Protein backbone atom coordinates (compact mmCIF):
# COMPACT_ATOMS: atom_id res chain seq x y z
CA UNK A 1 0.00 0.00 0.00
CA UNK A 2 1.42 3.40 -0.94
CA UNK A 3 1.59 6.30 1.46
CA UNK A 4 -0.46 9.37 0.59
CA UNK A 5 1.55 12.35 -0.61
CA UNK A 6 2.73 14.41 2.38
CA UNK A 7 1.63 17.62 0.66
CA UNK A 8 -0.93 18.89 -1.83
CA UNK A 9 -1.69 22.04 -3.77
CA UNK A 10 -5.36 22.90 -4.13
CA UNK A 11 -6.50 26.22 -5.62
CA UNK A 12 -9.33 26.23 -3.07
CA UNK A 13 -6.93 26.08 -0.10
CA UNK A 14 -4.70 29.08 0.62
CA UNK A 15 -4.80 30.12 -3.05
CA UNK A 16 -3.04 26.94 -4.13
CA UNK A 17 -0.12 27.13 -1.70
CA UNK A 18 1.60 23.78 -1.17
CA UNK A 19 0.17 22.52 2.14
CA UNK A 20 0.59 19.45 4.27
CA UNK A 21 -2.08 16.95 3.24
CA UNK A 22 -5.28 17.26 5.27
CA UNK A 23 -4.29 20.64 6.72
CA UNK A 24 -4.22 24.32 5.86
CA UNK A 25 -0.57 24.53 6.92
CA UNK A 26 1.75 25.58 4.10
CA UNK A 27 4.97 23.61 3.69
CA UNK A 28 6.72 26.98 3.51
CA UNK A 29 5.92 27.44 7.22
CA UNK A 30 8.14 24.43 8.01
CA UNK A 31 10.94 25.84 5.87
CA UNK A 32 10.58 29.22 7.62
CA UNK A 33 10.89 27.54 11.02
CA UNK A 34 13.97 25.58 10.00
CA UNK A 35 15.64 28.61 8.39
CA UNK A 36 15.05 30.55 11.62
CA UNK A 37 16.82 27.82 13.59
CA UNK A 38 13.69 26.47 15.24
CA UNK A 39 13.34 22.79 16.03
CA UNK A 40 10.93 20.45 14.30
CA UNK A 41 9.30 19.86 17.69
CA UNK A 42 8.56 23.61 17.91
CA UNK A 43 6.89 23.48 14.50
CA UNK A 44 4.85 20.42 15.47
CA UNK A 45 3.78 22.07 18.74
CA UNK A 46 2.61 25.15 16.85
CA UNK A 47 0.91 23.17 14.06
CA UNK A 48 -0.65 20.10 15.71
CA UNK A 49 -2.53 19.10 12.55
CA UNK A 50 0.81 18.22 10.91
CA UNK A 51 2.32 14.85 11.82
CA UNK A 52 5.98 14.08 12.40
CA UNK A 53 5.70 11.56 9.55
CA UNK A 54 4.54 14.28 7.17
CA UNK A 55 7.46 16.50 8.15
CA UNK A 56 9.90 13.62 7.67
CA UNK A 57 8.45 12.79 4.26
CA UNK A 58 8.68 16.41 3.09
CA UNK A 59 12.28 16.69 4.28
CA UNK A 60 13.22 13.41 2.57
CA UNK A 61 11.66 14.61 -0.69
CA UNK A 62 13.43 17.96 -0.38
CA UNK A 63 16.74 16.18 0.21
CA UNK A 64 16.19 13.96 -2.81
CA UNK A 65 15.39 17.01 -4.95
CA UNK A 66 18.60 18.71 -3.85
CA UNK A 67 20.67 15.62 -4.63
CA UNK A 68 19.02 15.21 -8.04
CA UNK A 69 19.62 18.87 -8.82
CA UNK A 70 23.28 18.57 -7.79
CA UNK A 71 23.78 15.51 -10.02
CA UNK A 72 22.26 17.27 -13.03
CA UNK A 73 24.30 20.46 -12.60
Task: Please provide the spans of the model-predicted regions.
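A short, structured beta-strand/loop element
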Residues: 2-41
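Long, charge-rich, low-complexity alpha-helical segments
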Residues: 25-73
Amino acid sequence: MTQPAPFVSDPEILSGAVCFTGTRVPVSALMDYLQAGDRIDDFLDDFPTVSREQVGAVLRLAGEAVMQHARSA
